[in-house]
């Protein structure tokens, strides 16, 4: 496990080394601010789930059917949230940066937009460790991390001619390219394949693409799309664009699932996680067991 975290730490800093070496301090500063916001989404959205999910998966490791059921539902909840956040930040990322950091960081906003498409997939990739650890295979996790690092580093080098924006896009491409192989490799010892992941999350991915495209079509060419300068204008753009996107997204998810099951699963997961953040209590029943 420690070896995996060591390799992962180097991978998470290689992009900074390459951008700083190839360009200049200003370019690195803009890139680093954009990356920090990108990484923050993973830590804020998946960290509260780590202990709950790992504990439940470990308890289910000797019951393959229960483990698969729990994992499928948990992946669905992560995808429900992650795909929405990723698509929405692709639409309003530059406005979020202008609101949080100020107008002088506009270049970071343009870089951050290229991280956006990878956020949802990054959240799914971050759950691969749950499988490796719950079935007692940390060595496989380390080996996969080394392969992942080699591929991602190669993409960074290939993307350098396009500047910091190219490196940001390389992150998104790497997550999208590796997510299915990552789950296939993690799930081999327990008979899970890449199709298991696809079946659990494809509706959320499709909903985010459709809702994002519809929202962009509505606002393209308007003053909102042109992102006028100013913190107040940025906040207004975020609120209007995100409201329209979320409406389309939730509606599409409900249509694709023929009902509100994803909303009930999300509510169940929130109930499971919330008590653990404010008080210690016995482990809750897995979210995968909700009817």
Predicted feature descriptions by range:
Residues 2, 15-17, 29-46, 73-80, ...:
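Alpha-helical transmembrane segments of polytopic membrane transporters and translocases
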Residues 68-123, 150-158, 209-217, 290:
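Alpha-helical transmembrane segments of multi-pass membrane transport and lipid-handling proteins
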Residues 17, 28-29, 140-142, 167-168, ...:
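Alpha-helical transmembrane segments and their helix-entry boundary regions
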Residues 4, 8, 12, 35, ...:
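Short runs within selected transmembrane alpha-helices of multi-pass transporters and secretion channels
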Residues 34, 38-75, 79-82, 129-134:
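Helix-loop junctions and terminal segments of transmembrane helices
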Residues 184-194, 216-291:
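Membrane-proximal transmembrane or re-entrant/amphipathic helices at the cytosolic face
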Residues 73, 107-111, 167, 196, ...:
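Residue-level signature of transmembrane alpha-helical entry/exit and packing/kink sites
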């Amino acid at each position: 496990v420690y070896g995996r975290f060591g390799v992962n730490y180097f991978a998470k800093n290689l992009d900074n080394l390459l951008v700083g070496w190839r360009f200049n301090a200003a370019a690195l500063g803009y890139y680093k601010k954009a990356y920090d916001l990108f990484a923050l989404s993973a830590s804020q959205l998946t960290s509260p789930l780590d202990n709950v999910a790992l504990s439940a998966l470990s308890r289910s490791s000797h019951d393959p059917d229960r483990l698969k059921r729990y994992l499928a539902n948990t992946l669905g909840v992560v995808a429900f949230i992650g795909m929405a956040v990723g698509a929405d930040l692709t639409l309003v990322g530059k406005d979020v940066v202008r609101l949080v950091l100020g107008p002088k960081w506009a270049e970071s906003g343009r870089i951050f937009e290229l991280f956006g498409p990878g956020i949802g997939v990054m959240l799914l990739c971050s759950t691969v460790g749950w499988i490796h650890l719950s079935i007692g295979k940390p060595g496989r996790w380390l080996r996969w991390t080394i392969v992942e690092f080699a591929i991602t580093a190669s993409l960074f080098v290939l993307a350098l001619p396009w500047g910091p924006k190219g490196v940001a896009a390389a992150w998104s491409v790497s997550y999208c390219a590796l997510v299915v192989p990552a789950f296939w490799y993690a799930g081999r010892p327990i008979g899970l394949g890449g199709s298991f992941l696809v079946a659990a999350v494809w509706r959320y991915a499709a909903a985010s693409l459709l809702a994002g495209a519809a929202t962009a079509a509505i606002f393209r060419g308007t003053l909102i799309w042109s992102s006028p300068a100013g913190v107040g204008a940025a906040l207004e753009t975020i609120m209007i664009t995100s409201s329209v996107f979320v409406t389309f997204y939730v509606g599409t998810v409900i249509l694709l699932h023929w009902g509100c099951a994803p909303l009930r699963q999300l509510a169940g997961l929130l109930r499971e996680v919330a008590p653990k953040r404010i008080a210690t209590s016995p482990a809750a029943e897995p979210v995968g067991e909700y009817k």
